[in-house]
Amino acid sequence: MSELKNMLDFTKEELENLVQPKFRAKQIFEWVYKKYADDFLQMSSLPKDFRVYLQKNFHFSPLKCVKDEKSKDGSIKYLFELLDGKKIEAVLLPMKEELVDENGKIIKHARYTICVSSQVGCKSGCSFCLTAKGGLSRNLSAGEIVGQILWIKKHNKIPYERRVNIVYMGMGEPLDNLKNVSKAVKILADNDALAISPRRQTISTSGLAKQIKELGEMNLGVLLAISLHAVNDELRSELMPINKAYNIASIMEAVRNFPIDQRKRVMFEYLLIDGINDKIEHAKELVKLLNGIKAKVNLILFNPHEGSLYNRPSVENAIKFQDYLSAKGVTCTIRESKGLDISAACGQLKERQSKQ
């Protein structure tokens, strides 16, 4: 393991306490996050002896891309190897294509969402998730989380000023690593770093009610997504063992008390699984659960993987489910499945790579 410190692990305030004079921290941040510098010696605005000091004591990112796969829909999945040899995944999702006029002038820039991992593996044990098979290995540091985004932006030549959305929906349970995830949020939001507003960062959780409360008390301004996937405790405990510790009632109570921008909604992710939770009776129960909550439901059609216990539902059933919710006044969308041809669901690329 390297004894060098990961520069991406530090907030600007922390860096100000390590380097003198303090304004050097701002300069370093601008080189790293705005100019995508990957060598301290390139930082020409810094004194040469200071650059040498940085080179001897810090590194930029422990990430090494060992495999990537590009889907026909433009999604790109990356498998990263960390300094200790552990592997994690991240995905670049193009949300809107670039628009140009007849003269080739850009009218609207392309928009992207980057899905990042927060842990190596996961201990939640969800029966439909491939990552859960291997259990939890360790938490990612803030720098390892930030590094995924920085690497993807740099290697896809996405300019610093181009807006991206961040979703903490990759490998791991983000709220099980709240300290480092919240630190990553702050680093990314810094105007001298990537300036990604917390309102463009969504933290997804399987429903850790205690940590939802802690996240709310931090008042970071992030968006919250709840991986619900079932409308009663019996079924949810079967699909998601974490429900035995935090049942649906406790999750809903935590959500009702969670501070969120009045212009935004709490997202509820609902994975539709054929014959398991995709019936109208489930939709009816979901409407009751969400009563009084400013919510948006994101329906996701199950993405099968090798050895999966479940099947993908029909599009027809998904539309019926959506129509029922919409008719009852619940904002609801069916998430466009991206990367089906590259196994872009969480843990699939890592699993395939390990078998090769």
UniProtKB/Swiss-Prot annotation:
UniProt-recorded Gene Ontology molecular function terms: 4 iron, 4 sulfur cluster binding; metal ion binding; rRNA (adenine(2503)-C2-)-methyltransferase activity; rRNA binding; tRNA (adenine(37)-C2)-methyltransferase activity; tRNA binding
Cell compartment(s), UniProt: Cytoplasm
Keywords: 4Fe-4S, Cytoplasm, Disulfide bond, Iron, Iron-sulfur, Metal-binding, Methyltransferase, rRNA processing, S-adenosyl-L-methionine, Transferase, tRNA processing
GO terms (BP aspect): rRNA base methylation; tRNA methylation
GO cellular component: cytoplasm
Main EC class the enzyme belongs to: transferase
Domain Radical SAM core: 108-341
Cofactor(s) recorded in Swiss-Prot or TrEMBL: [4Fe-4S] cluster
Annotated positions binding S-adenosyl-L-methionine: 172-173, 204, 227-229, 303
Reactions catalysed: adenosine(2503) in 23S rRNA + 2 reduced [2Fe-2S]-[ferredoxin] + 2 S-adenosyl-L-methionine = 2-methyladenosine(2503) in 23S rRNA + 5'-deoxyadenosine + L-methionine + 2 oxidized [2Fe-2S]-[ferredoxin] + S-adenosyl-L-homocysteine; adenosine(37) in tRNA + 2 reduced [2Fe-2S]-[ferredoxin] + 2 S-adenosyl-L-methionine = 2-methyladenosine(37) in tRNA + 5'-deoxyadenosine + L-methionine + 2 oxidized [2Fe-2S]-[ferredoxin] + S-adenosyl-L-homocysteine
Active site (record annotation): 89 (proton acceptor), 346 (s-methylcysteine intermediate)
Entries under SMART domains matching the protein: Elp3
Domain of life: Bacteria
Positions that bind [4Fe-4S] cluster: 122, 126, 129
UniProt xrefs under InterPro entries: Aldolase_TIM, Elp3/MiaA/NifB-like_rSAM, Methyltransferase_A, RlmN_N, RNA_MTrfase_RlmN, rRNA_lsu_MTrfase_RlmN/Cfr, rSAM
Function, in words: Specifically methylates position 2 of adenine 2503 in 23S rRNA and position 2 of adenine 37 in tRNAs. m2A2503 modification seems to play a crucial role in the proofreading step occurring at the peptidyl transferase center and thus would serve to optimize ribosomal fidelity.
NCBIfam families for this protein: rRNA_mod_RlmN
Stated family: Belongs to the radical SAM superfamily. RlmN family.
Full protein name: Dual-specificity RNA methyltransferase RlmN
Origin species: Campylobacter lari (strain RM2100 / D67 / ATCC BAA-1060)
Organism classification: Bacteria, Pseudomonadati, Campylobacterota, Epsilonproteobacteria, Campylobacterales
